Amino acid sequence: MREATVRRARLSASIAAQAAAAAPAAGPLSIANGKAYAVREPVSKRQYAILRLETTGGIVGWGETRTIAAADLAQAVAILRGRQATEYALLHARMAALPDLRAAANMALLDIVGQAAKAPVYQVLGGPTRHKVRALAIVPAGDDDAVLAACKRARAAGFRAFVIPAVAPASRNSGRPFVAANRKRVETLRGALGEDSDFVVDCAAALTPGDAASLSDALERLHPLWLDEPCEITSLAAIGKLAGERVTPLGFGRSLIASAGFQDLLREDLIDVFRPDLARSGITQIRKFAALAEANYVAVAPYHDGGPVETAAALHLAASLPNFFAQQVPVPDADEDRRFRAALAGAALESVTDGYLALSAEPGLGLKIDASLLGKEVA
């Protein structure tokens, strides 16, 4: 009886010690408050939400996602308040019910940690694994002339690789006309832009496996970087037939948040390029995905179609990954939108030279936020 009492006492003491260790400690990196802002670009009306976290020591960190609801913000701030920014991995797990907002919070917490350490985020994460980041220009959907014009603008802005939309099939299993139209599009673009131009063909998960197979065969000799989201991830057997019988690399992943679906693709050897959505997964989660991908010789090219804060996070993520491939970046058509993005977060952030984005050596994410452009506060 006495021994049992002693064991229970020791167990109770151990539990109390663990609880004390887990309790948030006050300090300059303790999160004091959080605010969010809805941002809209002036011409395109592209929308995204920017999160601002501030510590008790006055350090401000920034993150971004697509949208932030007031109720979700209140819930997130309740989780974050009083916690240390260095607990970003733990807090990422505790915000699992708020996937979009936790991605933004993860960026902001790492921004704070980097500023406190007086080091870029990629150094905090063990980088840099590279000193510049290959850039992919996102080309909006349109007819052949519109796509060519957008690619020419992007090339003039420094891009040498492009994510182009596939010509949509007229119907399911469209056959030869669909294949011919896509082959012509890629051939025309390469002829107009130069042999040093590379292309990712974005199918937006809109094709049947049969159409995707026909397209993959037709584009093989044109050497696209990869075929992006050729079909929905509903039948691993169908994707396996597509991946196993063709040479054109396949990219999947923008719809995946949990690791289970990604592990299925890896286990069956169905993927060449992993495309996690940065605005939904955040830096920490994608680094976990990337470690799994590296062990299976799969490259990582995060999906990003948001604002410049997300671009900054993407660059630091890229410079922390050994198996990073390329980073897509939105390219606004309107000069006013380009100026807006440059003024919002820093003029040099999205500047591309000979196909590459530069890494900032500034602490944290290296942002220079103009608060006057943040738009309406979420409340």
Task: Explain the meaning of each model-derived region.
Residues 1-22:
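N-terminal export leaders
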Residues 6, 15-16, 27-39, 43, ...:
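Flexible C-terminal active-site loop/helix
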Residues 54-119:
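Metal- or metallocofactor-binding catalytic centers and their adjacent structured scaffolds
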Residues 58, 105, 118, 162, ...:
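Conserved, mostly hydrophobic/aromatic
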Residues 65, 102, 178, 201-208, ...:
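Glycine- and other small-residue-rich loops at beta-strand/loop junctions that grip anionic moieties
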Residues 71-74, 82, 89, 234-356:
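Shared catalytic-loop signature of beta/alpha-barrel
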Residues 131-246:
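Metal-dependent enolase-superfamily TIM-barrel catalytic cores that perform enediolate-based chemistry
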